[in-house]
C-alpha cells in the first residue's frame, strides 16, 4: 500500500488571501502538472493528487502505471439497483441517480473527494470540444441537469467537472448562467468547479463565469494571461480571491484523506470478495424460458465454451475508464474453475470480433535481454542520428503505450522511442500484424519494414479519436521460430493528421497487435461441431473496450458480422444453448433475439468478471440484476436516431424530454409502474408490475417476485413478496427497487418526471 502521507498542519484561508501575492493566488487556479494541483509551500498548502475513477482508480499514469482493482462498468453497477452495495464499492456511474449518490457518499466517507462529470449534456464524442448541443430549457433541466441536481442534493460531492461541449451556444466552462447562476446561486453549490482536461477555452470569460480550476497543468490560459486580465480589469481582484478561496477550501478538505504517498497495488482478499459480488449481482437474467438455469455441474459430462468473448477478459470500457488490473478472470477461466474433474471442455473461438488486432501479451514475447515483455527506449533524436543516446528505458507488459502525462526533463514535445522484442511463433501459418498510432510509427520484422504508419496516415478512432486507422500486414510464420520485432515511434507532434474538434492530450500513443488468420467459415463449422457434441453449450459474445471507448461514437449497434453468423449457426444445432453477452451499452440482437431461450447479460464486469458469471450459471448467486437501460430492436427505434451527430457544429436534441425508452412508453393505467410500449424493445429498462420475474437461487430453488400495487383513499401501498417454486417464502438475496410517479396528466410528463424512490424500508411486509 505504501507509506501514508503525514498530515500537514492546517492553514488559514483568510490569512493566505490577505498575504499571498498576486502570482501565488493565480498559481492556485491551474494544475501543477497532469494529475496535481499547485501547492503553496510558503503557506503550508499541499498539492492535491487527482485520478480517473469511474470503475477503479488508475493512479497518475496512463503509461507504465501501477495496476489496480477494476470494478464493473457504470451500467453494470446500475443494474444491481443496490445502494448499500454501491456505497461499499465506491463506484460512480449509473443511469439511476440514486445509486450514483450512494457511490459518492461511500467514496467520500474515506476522505476522498468525488468529482461528478460532465456538467452537462456531454452525450457524444463527434466534434467533442466544439459541438453545440441545442435543446429546450425543459429538456435541459428535467433530463440533463436533474441527475446532477439530485446527486448534489443527496451526497454533496466535493467537485463538479465541466464538459467539453457547448450547450445552447456557449461552452459550459465559460457559461456564467450555468456555473455561477444555476449551479452556485440556484442550487446553492459550495464546492469546486474544475475543467475537464484541456477543456478551458478562455481566460477572463471562464474565470468570471465561475470556473475555479483549469486542468491539467502547466497552465495554458491562466498564469501570465490571467495576470494580464487582472491588470486590464477584465477580471477583478474580488473574483480572483473568490476562485482562490474555493480552491483552498477544496485542498483543505482533501488534506484530511489518509492516502498513500506512493502509488502501489492494493490486492486484499476482502476487495476480491466485494468485486466478485459486484460482478455477479450486476448480471441480468434476460431469458430462462426452458428452465435450464441454474446448471448443476455434477451432472455434466461435456461443455462447449464457444465465442470470441469466452477467453477474453472484457473487464472495462476504453478511454478514461480503462486501467490495467492486477488480475482478471475471463468467462472461460471462471466456468472451468467450477467444473468438476473429468468434464470434457470443448473450446472454440467461432469468430473474430475485435475492433483492433489483439495486443501481444508478455508471455508471447521477451525483451532483447530475455525478460518477459517488450523493451522500450526513449531518445531525443530520430533513428537517423548515429549513436544517439538513450534518455530513458523501461519494459512494458502490453504492446500498447499512451504517453499523455509522460515526461522526462531531457525530452522535448517531439521525441522518439524504439519498442523491441523477440517473438516465438505460436503456430505455423499466416499472421496479421496491426499498428495504430498518434504520432508516427513503423513496424519492422527481422529488419524488414512491414507496416509504414509514418509516410502516409489515415485518420481513425485510436487514442481518443486523435490517432490513425490501424494499418495491417500479413506475414507467414513458422511455429517455434524466433522473429525480431521493432517499432520505431515518434511522439504526437510528428503526426500528419489534422483533426478539428478532438481533444489533444499530448504525448503520443501506439498500439501493436498480432493474430493468427483464420477461415471464418471453418471457425463457425468447428464451433457448430463442438455444440453438437456437448451436453451444454455456452456461447460468449459481445463487445470490448475497443468497441466502446471515449474519443469516438459507435457508428452502428451491430455486433461484428461473423459474430451474428456464429450465434445463428450455433442456435440452429443447439437451440438450448446459453447465450452470454457482454457490453456496457445496447447492441442489436436481431435476428436471433427471439430464438435464444436462455440469455444472461454480464456487462464489463471488472477483475472478477469470469468468477461472477460462473457463480450465476451454477446457482451460487441469484441473478438479481435489472436493466438500467433498454435494448432496442434496431437503431432506427431510438429517439435520437434522426438527430444524432454534429452537423455544421450543432446537434439538435429533437427528442426533448423523451429520452431512451420514455418515447416508447404509454401510461394508460393509474400506476406509473406499468411499462407498455408502442414498439417494444428487445429488453426494456427495469421491470413491470402486473408481471412475474423469475429468478433462481442455489439448489435450483426458483423464486418468483410478486409486486402488488393497492390503492387506499388516494394512496398507494406496495407489497413485495418472494416465494419459491415449492411455495416456500424467503429471501433470494436480490435488492428490489421500486419507483412511483404520475402517469396521466394534462401536462406531458415522462415516466420519471417527479418520480420518487420507495426506500428498501418500504418492503417491511416481506
UniProtKB/Swiss-Prot annotation:
Key words of the record: Carbohydrate metabolism, Cellulose degradation, Glycoprotein, Glycosidase, Hydrolase, Polysaccharide degradation, Secreted
Region Disordered, residue ranges: 726-766
Enzyme class (EC, first level): hydrolase
Keyword Hydrolase belongs to the record: yes
Catalytic reaction equation(s): Hydrolysis of terminal, non-reducing beta-D-glucosyl residues with release of beta-D-glucose
Glycosylation sites: 19, 288, 453, 748
Protein name: Probable beta-glucosidase K
Species the sequence originates in: Aspergillus fumigatus (strain CBS 144.89 / FGSC A1163 / CEA10) (Neosartorya fumigata)
Amino acid at each position: 500500500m505504501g507509506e501514508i502521507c503525514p498530515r500537514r498542519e492546517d492553514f488559514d484561508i483568510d490569512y493566505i488571501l490577505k498575504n499571498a501575492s498576486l502570482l501565488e493566488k493565480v498559481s492556485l487556479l491551474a494544475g501543477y502538472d497532469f494529475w496535481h494541483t499547485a501547492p503553496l509551500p510558503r503557506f503550508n498548502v499541499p498539492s492535491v493528487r487527482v485520478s480517473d475513477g469511474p470503475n477503479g482508480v488508475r493512479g497518475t499514469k496512463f503509461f507504465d502505471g501501477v495496476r489496480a482493482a477494476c470494478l464493473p462498468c457504470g451500467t453494470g453497477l446500475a443494474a444491481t439497483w443496490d445502494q448499500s452495495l454501491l456505497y461499499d464499492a465506491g463506484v460512480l456511474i449509473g443511469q439511476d441517480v440514486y445509486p450514483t449518490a450512494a457511490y459518492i457518499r461511500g467514496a467520500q466517507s474515506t476522505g476522498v473527494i468525488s468529482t461528478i462529470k460532465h456538467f452537462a449534456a456531454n452525450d457524444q464524442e463527434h466534434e467533442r470540444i466544439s459541438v453545440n448541443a441545442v435543446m429546450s430549457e425543459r429538456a435541459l433541466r428535467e433530463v440533463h441537469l436533474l441527475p446532477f441536481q439530485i446527486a448534489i442534493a443527496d451526497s454533496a460531492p466535493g467537485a463538479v467537472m465541466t464538459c467539453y461541449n457547448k450547450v445552447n451556444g456557449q461552452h459550459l466552462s465559460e457559461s456564467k448562467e450555468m456555473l455561477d447562476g444555476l449551479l452556485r446561486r440556484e442550487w446553492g453549490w459550495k464546492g469546486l468547479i474544475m475543467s475537464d482536461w484541456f477543456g478551458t477555452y478562455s481566460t477572463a470569460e471562464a474565470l468570471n463565469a465561475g470556473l475555479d480550476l483549469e486542468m491539467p497543468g502547466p497552465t495554458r490560459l491562466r498564469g501570465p494571461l490571467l495576470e494580464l486580465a487582472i491588470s486590464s480589469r477584465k477580471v477583478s481582484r474580488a473574483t480572483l480571491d473568490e476562485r482562490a478561496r474555493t480552491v483552498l477550501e477544496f485542498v483543505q478538505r482533501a488534506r484530511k484523506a489518509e492516502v498513500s504517498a506512493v502509488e502501489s497495488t492494493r490486492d486484499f482478499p476482502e476487495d476480491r470478495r466485494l468485486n466478485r459480488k459486484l460482478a455477479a449481482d450486476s448480471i441480468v437474467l434476460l431469458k430462462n424460458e426452458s428452465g435450464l438455469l441454474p446448471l448443476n455441474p455434477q451432472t455434466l459430462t461435456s461443455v462447449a465454451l464457444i465465442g470470441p468473448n469466452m477467453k477474453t477478459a472484457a473487464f472495462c470500457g476504453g478511454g478514461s475508464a480503462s486501467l490495467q488490473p492486477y488480475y482478471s478472470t475471463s468467462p472461460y477461466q471462471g466456468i472451468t474453475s467450477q467444473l468438476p474433474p473429468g468434464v470434457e471442455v470443448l473450446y472454440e473461438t467461432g469468430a473474430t470480433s475485435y475492433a483492433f488486432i489483439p495486443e501481444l501479451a508478455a508471455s508471447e514475447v521477451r525483451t532483447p535481454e530475455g525478460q518477459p515483455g517488450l523493451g522500450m527506449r526513449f531518445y531525443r533524436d530520430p533513428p537517423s542520428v548515429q549513436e544517439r543516446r538513450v534518455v530513458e528505458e523501461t519494459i512494458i507488459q502490453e504492446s500498447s503505450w499512451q504517453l499523455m502525462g509522460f515526461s522526462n526533463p531531457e525530452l522535448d514535445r517531439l521525441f522518439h522511442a524504439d519498442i523491441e522484442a523477440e517473438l516465438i511463433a505460436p503456430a505455423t501459418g499466416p499472421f496479421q500484424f496491426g499498428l495504430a498510432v498518434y504520432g508516427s510509427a513503423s513496424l519492422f520484422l527481422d529488419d524488414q519494414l512491414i507496416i509504414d504508419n509514418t509516410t502516409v496516415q489515415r485518420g481513425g478512432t485510436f487514442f481518443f479519436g486523435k490517432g490513425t486507422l490501424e494499418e495491417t500486414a500479413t506475414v507467414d510464420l513458422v511455429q517455434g521460430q524466433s522473429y525480431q520485432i521493432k517499432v520505431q515511434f515518434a511522439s504526437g507532434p510528428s503526426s500528419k493528421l489534422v483533426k478539428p474538434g478532438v481533444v489533444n492530450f499530448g504525448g503520443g500513443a501506439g498500439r501493436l497487435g498480432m493474430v493468427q488468420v483464420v477461415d471464418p467459415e471453418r471457425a463457425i463449422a468447428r464451433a457448430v461441431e463442438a455444440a453438437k457434441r456437448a451436453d451444454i453449450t455456452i456461447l460468449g459474445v459481445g463487445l470490448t473496450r475497443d468497441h466502446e471507448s471515449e474519443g469516438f461514437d459507435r457508428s452502428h449497434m451491430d455486433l461484428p458480422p461473423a459474430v451474428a453468423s456464429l450465434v445463428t449457426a450455433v442456435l440452429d444445432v443447439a437451440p438450448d444453448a446459453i447465450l452470454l453477452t457482454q457490453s456496457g451499452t445496447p447492441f442489436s440482437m436481431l435476428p436471433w433475439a427471439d430464438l435464444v431461450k436462455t440469455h444472461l447479460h454480464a456487462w464489463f464486469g471488472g477483475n472478477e468478471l469470469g468468477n461472477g458469471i460462473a457463480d450465476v450459471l451454477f446457482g451460487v448467486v441469484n441473478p438479481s440484476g435489472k436493466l438500467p437501460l433498454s435494448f432496442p430492436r434496431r437503431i432506427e427505434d431510438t429517439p435520437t436516431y434522426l438527430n444524432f451527430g454534429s452537423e455544421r457544429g450543432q446537434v439538435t436534441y429533437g427528442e426533448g424530454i423523451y429520452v431512451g425508452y420514455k418515447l416508447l412508453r404509454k401510461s394508460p393505467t393509474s400506476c406509473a409502474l406499468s411499462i407498455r410500449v408502442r414498439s417494444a424493445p428487445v429488453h426494456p429498462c427495469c421491470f413491470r408490475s402486473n408481471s412475474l420475474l423469475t429468478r433462481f437461487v442455489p439448489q435450483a430453488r426458483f423464486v418468483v417476485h410478486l409486486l402488488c400495487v393497492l390503492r387506499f383513499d388516494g394512496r398507494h401501498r406496495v407489497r413485495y413478496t418472494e416465494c419459491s417454486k415449492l411455495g416456500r417464502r424467503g429471501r433470494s438475496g436480490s435488492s428490489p427497487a421500486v419507483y412511483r410517479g404520475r402517469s396521466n396528466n394534462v401536462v406531458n410528463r415522462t415516466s420519471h418526471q417527479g418520480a420518487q424512490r420507495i426506500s428498501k424500508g418500504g418492503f417491511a411486509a416481506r
